[in-house]
Amino acid sequence: MTIETYTGPMFCEKTGRMIREIMVKEHGGWVQGEDFEVFNHATDTRYGDGVISTHDGDQVPSYMAKDSFDLLGKIAEWDGSCWVLREEYADLKTIFVDEAEFFDMDLIGVVDYIDQMLGVDVYLAGLDTDFRGKPFPGPMPGLLAIADRVHKYKAGCKSEEKCGEGATRTQRIVNGVPAGYHD
């Protein structure tokens, strides 16, 4: 099975690339809720509840999971000795997880279990670093380590100079001004 990640700074189209992959699956006849499922962290309500969304407004319905085991419990159930796919997800092939950086550290083990033991491919999108360029606190560093494929993207530089180069970091803005390293 496969664990695949889309990572990079904000505005590098991580979610957009994942939505395009979902559209390919749907075009191939896959059905959400049977062949694949989409998850987002419950705290990400920027574009409404129950969706993953690009900054341009492209959206896909999603299950809003409050933590890693909520995500696992949506597709699997404990049979007394191990997690098994729920009957309604017997044909599940793939899950998509947006904003993976917001989940708890258990996501690393949950994703590995879903991939290795349940035989389900996992696609994840999330920030790999903070505005300082340091690893984003949470599960992303561990998820990148266990991923079979890591796609790291750059955003378009939006500095006042509009340099046109690829941006490798997310710029934190405080009161309309770019934050310093210690802000």
Q: Positions of the model-derived regions?
A:
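Short acidic/histidine-rich motifs immediately flanking catalytic phosphotransfer sites
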Residues: Y89-T94
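Conserved P-loop
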Residues: M1-V84, D130-G142, A155, G180
